[in-house]
Amino acid sequence: MLCTVYKSTRKADTYLFVKKRDCFDDVPEALMAMFGTPQLVMVFPIAKRESLGMADIHKVRAAIDENGYYLQIPPPQVNLLAEHKRNLGLQD
């Protein structure tokens, strides 16, 4: 199975994986509105891949099979200063 990846024009580091190029029928309208105009990143055979950069390949495959799409969002940013203060036992 081929997988097509698009990046969001509205949300940084946010990617949408779908089964077919330019086919967003399974993606909810509210998600598409938040995502913005999809920009094509790549098309690849997902069955032949063992890993992906930031996403768990098994979760991506399962989501595409069940929902027709997978949304990859960036991990939350860590406040390094607050973490350092916490490690030192200091309060904010």
UniProtKB/Swiss-Prot annotation:
Superkingdom: Bacteria
Pfam families: YcgL
Record-annotated membrane-spanning stretches: none
SUPFAM superfamilies with a match to the protein in the record: YcgL-like
YcgL domain location: 1-85
HAMAP family linked: UPF0745
Name assigned to this protein: YcgL domain-containing protein Sputw3181_2259
